[in-house]
Amino acid sequence: MIISGKELSVKLKDEMKAQVATFPDKYGRVPHLVVILVGEDPGSVSYVTGKAKASEYVGIKNTTIRKPDSISEAELLTLIDQLNADDSVDGILVQLPLPKHISEDKVIAAIAKEKDVDGFHPLNVAALWQKQDCVLPCTPKGIIKMLKVAGVEIKGKRAVVIGRSNIVGLPVSKLLLDENATVTIAHSRTVDLPSVTRNAEILVVAIGRPKFVTADMVAEGAVVIDVGVNRDPETGKLCGDVDYAAIEPKASVITPVPGGVGPMTITCLMENTIECFLRKQSIA
């Protein structure tokens, strides 16, 4: 079974579109997402464009603020402070990566917790690990949604996550734990990685290396979630972290690249923006 994140995201966006259409009558306005883009990295520009298109489709107001990569850290932090204080702004996202002279940790921590639509703020991360109500990181949230829609039973399953980043690896491991999977986190220093991955009933791969996971590393009937977005060094085409053509016949469930996890990440960003907006309305 192939899980199409593209198809699922369209369904979810249609539901959100209907929900947002009721907001002007209920609350006097629609949610407002501000995206800050520093520099002209082609990948970042593409992601920001995708977020703007999704916002427009759902009916969320989207403002993209473009800054040159020469902007100072202090100037960027001042801009974030201004957006934090702006009551018309519900969500703030700073597109990563940032230029080397700017601390990503400082920038993430500067965003108001209640406007952190990425779920990266230290207080949101702490709340996730404490099982408290919080904004969930978009990609891990999307992965769990895809597993559930595909009818995958997570409880009691052996799940292996390759990758330990704060953006995907660690939070998706926690969400799988919360669904009562038995989770192993593997990484670049894991000894005999194939023996670890072959034990996985659910395998999540998020390392950013094209076709790194080969068919002999995957058990027959495994569920394979490919988070990677890379260029195939041979063809130049987009590919994931797993060798899709070789693994798809073995897997019971698999996500393609493109059209798998990627669309769900942007869709969950829309969900998080609505969530931040509604929380503000409930407090007001």
Residue ranges of model-derived segments:
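Short beta-strand segments enriched in small/hydrophobic residues
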Residues: 31-39
